[in-house]
From Swiss-Prot:
Present with 704 molecules/cell in log phase SD medium. This is Protein SCD5. Residues 1-98, 209-239, 280-321, 338-358, 460-489, 516-571, 591-620, 649-681, 697-758, 806-838 are annotated as: Disordered. GO terms for molecular function: protein phosphatase 1 binding.
Length: 872
């Protein structure tokens, strides 16, 4: 087909002829020239076609460049993989001078991508980035400038940005999400492969670009590389210690000849090293006074130079960063404002007026030096003067004051608990008022008791007993030594009072004991201290007995009529015809236990009403008031005998009283046994005659109301205090048997047994009994072991019995006046022995004690047999 009919005569067809000569080049169809005199050799301006105003459909309407192959070769970039001109392509000249040409294949590639055309990594990353840009722009359509701003950290070159703008010129101001995916694909290919993107690259998959790490160095100043060590240096032994190779040797067991070395590429960073000079120079600080003097001398020598210097200083501005003294000197040198600084601060002299004023105020200037602070207010005046740095003037023979330095005193401890240390110091000063020696040495801190005042009272009550005229200097000299810390009891004051009153066992009863006894026997509250004052029983009254003082209010009403000189006596201190006498010839092998911390079943047998005693057991406490008030409104022998006859305590009633004991007692016998018990009771006259016949039947051991817990005097000894106390704790366990319902009704009957707790209810010890009787008694005791096993085992833990001499009871000077009351008391003793016989300790080392134990055991066996009618 020929296009010659289009040729119009008269027109310049040179361009067309040239185009016809090149049909074989394959640059396009035959040229149809619409040239109207435009110079085609001139470079085409980018403003010839309004690229921004064209839409996506206008891409086919492009200006065709029909130039030679040289112009077509310039359309492609040097870095582009395709070096041939695309057939039927589009050639564009960018503003940077590069020519961009789009082939028909490029024109067929869409500028948008769907999610199906992306990889999973691209979808996940590009969607996140798109949402980030939308959040910043507050819209769903983004611009290319927003994308480039978001990709600032990727360091895109300007050529890449221009090429992408040229490709997406139709939608550069409004990119949807598909076009955004296409833009990022071209950006990733340009960043990773370092080429200018083309339109056809949109369909090619590309990895996701990763930004430059923040911590990475721009120029890679430091590079760590492995360097092999030289064998020659290793052989010489001059190499440094390589901790990395040593660590690898410990971990892997192999030695490595490589080490990591840091190599700095940038020369600027190589020079930055800290170097220490081996030569250290010292320079004295400048002396300002010397400089000023030198300057003044120089100015005197050269006054013209001084004026010039002043002029230069006046003209130059002040440097306010100078130190204050130099700045003041500069201001003084200027002398422009005389009111600001008249003279140098160091050169100001005191005037005569100022000197006179200071002389007048000299006395008042030292007023505030003697003010006592909070710390010095509690110190004596001498220490205050020492603290303020002054010395005390002391006058000597010539009346001249010589300063004397007093030694510093150590800090004294402050008692945070009770006032033990304070009272102890005051008490010691009262005991030793004439101690002229002043202890100036450092004293150790003394312990302060945070509990009760046991240690305090113990130390103060022991001091009067140990003070002797000859021992005064010894106490003074020993007080300066280091004393070990002494324990302080945090419980009750029982152990304290026991230790202080127990040394008075062998002393006669003093008037103080008489006064305490008479005052305390008139009220039920003071029954405990009455037994404290006895020579043998030194249990104190507990501080916790106050809640139980009102247990028996009826006793307090009847008690004033019950006081009788024949019957108000304690265990070892008795009132005989109005006189208080002690039991004669009572030997104590040990003192009494340290504390009254026995269980509840044992506290009913103590000699002072303690805190854990029920009401039905309190009637058996060892107090004359509790003994006689309920059973004896009037103390007469006939009335006492009738009362005791009516209130004979059966084993059942006794078992009621002992319901708190840990030992398992036998169950109460049937009522028929009680009737047999009444028939088997020996009359008081017969019992009293038996007591008269037996010389060694002496009330030696107190009957603590059917309790086997306290059977020996060693139980109350301070030497065995800890052992006895812990044994009593270990042996105590609550009784599984409940309290019978008739416990309250037996209270009156139990009170009659309280008299026996006053007396010494150990049975008569016959010294003439043989060893065969002891063997028989042991056999019988084994039969009773299951019944009274707990009692016998605990009794054997406390060796020792109280004995009197074998002399006749009538031959003793302090024989108690029994009468009918004595018969009654011994009858109750016999009855209580029948119910709960007390065993003696078999573990006594002395032979006499063993013999006494044999006799007591035999007597108990006889009492048991009489009780159960096994022997006529």
């Amino acid at each position: 087909m020929s296009f010659d009919w289009l040729n119009v005569p008269g027109l310049d067809l040179s361009s067309g002829d040239q185009a016809e000569k090149r049909p074989s080049n394959g640059l396009g169809p035959p040229s149809v020239s619409f040239d109207f005199g435009i110079n085609t050799a001139a470079p085409h301006d980018s403003s010839f076609w309004d690229q921004g105003s064209r839409s996506h459909s206008d891409t086919t309407l492009s200006y065709r460049n029909n130039h030679s192959n040289t112009a077509a070769d310039n359309a492609t970039n040097v870095s582009s993989p395709q070096k041939d001109n695309p057939p039927n392509g589009e050639v564009r000249t960018l503003s940077g001078g590069d020519v961009y040409a789009e082939s028909p294949e490029d024109m067929q590639v869409p500028l948008s991508l769907s999610q199906n055309q992306l990889t999973h990594e691209e979808i996940r990353t590009y969607l996140r980035w798109y949402h980030y840009i939308c959040l910043r722009t507050h819209g769903k359509l983004v611009r290319l400038n927003d994308v480039f701003r978001f990709l600032t950290n990727f360091n895109l070159s300007q050529k890449v940005k221009d090429r992408i703008v040229e490709i997406f010129r139709s939608c550069k101001n409004a990119l949807n999400i598909g076009q955004f995916f296409a833009v990022l694909r071209l950006v990733s290919r340009a960043i990773i492969y370092g080429i200018l993107p083309l339109r056809r690259m949109i369909l090619e998959k590309a990895p996701v670009p990763k930004p430059r790490p923040i911590l990475s160095s721009e120029n890679h100043e430091e590079v760590y590389e492995e360097v092999e060590d030289d064998d020659s240096s290793a052989k010489t032994g001059d190499q440094k210690v390589d901790f990395d190779s040593f660590a690898s040797l410990l971990l892997t067991g192999k030695t490595t000849r490589k080490r990591v070395r840091r190599r700095i590429k940038n020369l600027n960073f190589k020079s930055k090293k800290v170097r220490f000079s081996e030569h250290i120079t010292f320079q004295d600080p400048p002396n300002l006074n010397q400089e000023s003097s030198n300057n003044s001398e120089a100015r005197k020598q050269d006054p013209d130079a001084e004026d010039e210097d002043q002029d230069s200083n006046n003209d130059s501005p002040l440097d306010f960063t100078l130190p204050m003294d130099q700045l003041l000197k500069r201001l003084y040198k200027r002398r422009k404002n005389s009111g600001l600084v008249s003279s140098l601060p160091s050169e100001q002299q005191e005037t005569e007026e100022e000197k006179k004023v200071l002389e007048d105020m000299k006395d008042s200037l030292s007023h505030f030096k003697q003010i006592q602070t909070v710390d010095s207010a509690s110190l004596p005046i001498s220490s205050v003067f020492l603290q303020n740095g002054n010395t005390l003037p002391t006058s000597n023979v010539n009346n001249t004051t010589v300063p004397q330095q007093l030694p510093l005193e150590p800090l004294k401890p402050t008692a945070t608990g009770s006032a033990n240390h304070l009272v102890r110091e005051e008490y010691n000063q009262g005991l030793h008022p004439s101690n002229g020696a002043i202890q100036t040495g450092l004293q150790p801190l003394k312990p302060t008791a945070t509990g009760s005042a046991n240690y305090l009272m113990r130390s103060h009550m022991e001091q009067p007993q140990s003070i002797k005229p000859s021992s005064t200097p010894e106490t003074v000299t020993n007080s300066g030594g280091l004393q070990p810390l002494k324990p302080t009891a945090t419980g009750s004051a029982n152990y304290l009072m026991k230790q202080h009153i127990s040394p008075s066992v062998n002393n006669p009863v003093s008037s103080m004991f008489q006064a305490q006894f008479t005052n305390q026997s008139s009220s039920p509250q003071s029954t405990g201290p009455a037994f404290l004052n006895s020579p043998n029983i030194t249990l104190p009254q507990s501080n916790q007995q106050q809640p139980y003082q009102e247990v028996n209010p009826t006793q307090a009403k009847i008690e004033p009529s019950n006081i009788s000189p024949q019957h108000t006596y304690s265990n070892n201190v008795r009132i005989n015809n109005g006189n208080i006498v002690s039991m004669p010839k009572v030997e104590i092998t040990g003192a009494f236990p340290p504390q009254n911390t026995l269980p509840q079943h044992q506290q009913s047998h103590l000699l002072s009403p303690q805190n854990t005693i029920p009401q039905h057991q309190r009637s058996q406490l060892i107090s004359p008031q509790n003994t006689f008030t309920q059973n004896q409104p009037i103390l007469s022998p006939q009335h006492t005998y009738s009362n005791n006859q009516a209130t004979m305590i059966s084993p059942q009633n006794t078992y009621t009283n002992n319901q708190q004991q840990p030992q398992h007692l036998p169950p109460p016998p049937p009522p028929r046994a009680q009737q047999q018990q009444q028939g088997a009771i020996v009359p008081p006259q017969h019992m009293y005659s038996n007591v008269q016949k037996q010389n060694n039947l002496v009330p030696t051991q107190p009957s603590y109301t059917n309790s086997p817990s306290i059977q020996s005097p060693n139980f109350l000894s301070p030497q065995n205090a800890a052992n006895s106390y812990f044994q009593s704790l270990l042996s105590s366990s609550p009784s599984p048997n409940p309290t019978p319902s008739n416990a309250s009704t037996v209270n009156g009957n139990n009170a009659s047994n309280g008299i026996s707790s006053f007396q010494n209810t150990s049975a008569a010890m016959n010294n003439t009994q043989s060893h065969q009787t002891y063997i028989q008694q042991q056999q019988q005791q084994q039969t009773q072991q299951r019944i009274y096993g707990g009692q016998l085992s605990q009794m054997q833990q406390h060796p020792g019995q109280l004995h009197l001499n074998n002399s006749d009871i009538h031959s003793q000077p302090n024989k108690p006046n029994y009468g009918m009351l004595g018969q009654q008391v011994h009858q109750q003793q016999q009855q209580q022995q029948q119910q709960f016989p007390f065993t003696a300790d078999v573990n006594r080392s002395n032979s006499s004690d063993i013999l006494g134990n044999l006799q007591s055991l035999q007597q108990q066996v006889d009492a048991l047999q009489i009780q159960y009618n096994r022997r006529p």
